[in-house]
Amino acid sequence: MRVVAGTARGRRLEAPPGSVTRPTSDRVRDAIATALGSLGMVAGSEVLDLWAGSGAMGIELLSRGARSATFVERDRRALETIRGNLERTGLVAASTVARDDALTWCATGGRHDVALCDPPYVFDDWPALLAVVPAPFVVAESARPVAATDGWGLVREKRYGTTVVTFLRRQEQAP
C-alpha cells in the first residue's frame, strides 16, 4: 500500500497487524481523493478520518493538500500503525491522532470540512453517525449504499467490487 499522489507520493504505508481493519485499496483511495478534489474538498480542508485503520485515506488527502487531519481509531495496534505511517510520510505536524469510538468522538469533537467514514462492514447505524458527525461533507465506505437521512443529500455513489462509496452533503436549513 502506497500514497498515490501529492507530497508523499510513493511512500509505503503499513497496515495494522491481524484482521482488525480492512485497508482501502490504492485504486479506491485514489478515486475518492480525486473525486473530493474535483468537488473542491481537498486543498486547505480539515479532514476527519473515522475508523481510520492505517490512516491511509486521511494521509492521502494530507499529501494532496489538506490543511490538517484528525484520525479517530479505537484499536491500539491500528493507532500505532497510523502514527508510524504519519512519521514515514512526514505528515505528523498536520495531524492529530485520537483513541476513541467514532460515534463518541463525533459527539464531542471539533468541526471539520470532510469526514471519511470506513467502519466495519457490519456497522449499520448511519443515521446516528450522520446526526452527530461534525462535518458538512461525508464519504462513507460500506458493503451497501448509505441512504441520505434527513438533512443530508446524495452527491455521488460508486461501487468498487464489494465496497460502495457514498458521498453525502449536509443540506442547508431554511431559516
Regions found by a protein language model. Give the residues of each.
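Class I S-adenosyl-L-methionine-dependent methyltransferase catalytic core
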Residues: M1-P175
